Amino acid sequence: MKNSFFSSLAKFASLSLAFALPTAEVIPSALEERQSCANTATTRSCWGQYSASTNSYTTVPKTGYWLVVQNTTLSADGVSRPTLNFNGTIPGPQITADWGDDVIVHVTNKLTSNGTSIHWHGIRQLNNAQYDGVPGITQCPIAPGGTLTYKFHADNYGSSWYHSHFILQYGDGLFGPLVINGPATANYDVDLGMLFLNDWNHVPVQSLWDKAKTGAPPTLLTGLMNGTNTYNGAGKKFQTTFTPGLKYRIRVVNTAVDGHFQFSIDGHSFQVIAMDFVPIVPYNATSILVSIAQRYDIIVTANAAVGNYWIRAGWQTACSGNTNAANITGILRYTGSSSTADPTTTSTVTASTSCLDEPLASLVPFVPINPVASSIMKTTLTTGGGQWLFNGSSLLLNWTDPTLLTVLNSGNIWPTEYNVIPIESTTANKGWAVLAISGPNGPNHPIHLHGHDFWTLSQGTGAYTATTALNLVNPPRRDVMTLPTGGHLVIAFQIDNPGSWLMHCHIAWHASEGLALQFVESESSILPTIGTADVSTFQNTCAAWKAWTPTEPFPQDDSGI
């Protein structure tokens, strides 16, 4: 790894702070028919930017979402700073679809000095690996000025997010909500949508990378709730309003760089009905532990006394620090409350500092599916020299030579540092991959697998051994689960989705330091799943990236993800 990257980024950070970036350009972000006039009881002739007067023989609406990646100065907590964002907002525009829809998102990179790529977190991408959005694995980065149209099928439903998977970009604001509508395991009256919890700084996250790589991770400054907060008397709190007696669905997501949260609402309990994209048997709670990239759907009944209540994102201090941890809050106001002042409520929740997941016994999938564990792959996580390593190898990708390109060229040999594990469905493994991860003392690690939900067979203290008990009866399944400090995590997933799939720690520093591997799944079946048009798109994106890289001011100096 080269030190030039750190010095270049530091210069970039200081320049960005010294000179204001352009203000946000407002870009349409929803489906066209939702952008202009709505088709309502009194405007039935209207259809977005079209109407009953439109000649349908010559004009057909183009549906999809349009996202623009850009540098702008924003004041999320009252302090102006350079950010990266989609369409001028943090979080970016919500992408909404129904279960079974085909989703089309056009992403344009208006950054002048960096590439980008967008990952649709938790989307299965069945037979669709080319649109998973990981540079160096499923695509080349989108070069400045370029546009890539992502296409995927909503095979699963629930709550998630989309974000940049290029270096540390999402930590500077490059993320947004992704909601796939579908059934729920409990009833409610109002869907309040996504509630984002994230850490935040007043300098670009990139400028902290040098410290994160060479020593202890930096202490982060503050945090945001749905893209807003206060700092030293400036800014504003996130607020939402309840009507007494109604039930509200809230989709909580942790999009932090290095922060684990305990979410609660003073004076309220709630039902938990989903984890990640998996509906669960509802259970009652007064708080939930939310690791990085995890999502929980909760239903809150407005049954407290009319008034104002704090919404809290409690910082989990065992894994990282935050200077203003106690200030990551929002406000719940009841209809009928005459006060607009800050709440005076206190929390009765027992504070947790563990950085662990919700108890496994609480996380019962609503649709029971039993995994198979006939053969187990073992991997050990270690650290040293500013890197994290799986079985002694730290991930290091080449953005111009993604894994999928080798597959498209009928190859099956990758550099050692690509950390490739080939997997195939066989009679011996009965179509299941089982991975036992053992880790050292130190921080917990939220492990995310692309292309699959996985079943958690065991999670606990101590390294995995042949005597470790495995749960094979409807264990929790999701796409992010925590590897405990000095402990183990045993996961299983079905070998049913040809592609190259990244597995990594979702602490951004650790991902950049190489804490990742990839599964090349059913290699001979990957190419047949990619149509000719998609192969052409893939190749054109790589050609544009290769043409731009000779002028790239910031050479790659992290793992690539």
From Swiss-Prot:
Coiled coil: none
GO cellular component terms, A-Z: extracellular region
Chief location bin: secreted
Compartments it resides in: Secreted
Binding site for Cu cation 2: H121, H163, H506
Disulfide bonds, paired cysteine numbers: C140-C542
EC number: 1.10.3.2
Keyword annotations from UniProtKB, A to Z: Copper, Disulfide bond, Glycoprotein, Lignin degradation, Metal-binding, Oxidoreductase, Repeat, Secreted, Signal
InterPro entries found in the cross-reference section: Cu-oxidase-like_N, Cu-oxidase_2nd, Cu-oxidase_C, Cu-oxidase_fam, Cu_oxidase_CS, Cu_oxidase_Cu_BS, Cupredoxin
Residue positions with a glycan: N71, N87, N114, N226, N284, N327, N391, N398
Reaction catalysed by this enzyme: 4 hydroquinone + O2 = 4 benzosemiquinone + 2 H2O
PANTHER family in the cross-refs: MULTI-COPPER OXIDASE, OXIDOREDUCTASE TPCJ
Functional description taken from the UniProt entry: Lignin degradation and detoxification of lignin-derived products.
Entry protein name: Laccase-1
Taxonomic classification: Eukaryota, Fungi, Dikarya, Ascomycota, Pezizomycotina
Gene assigned in the entry: lcc1
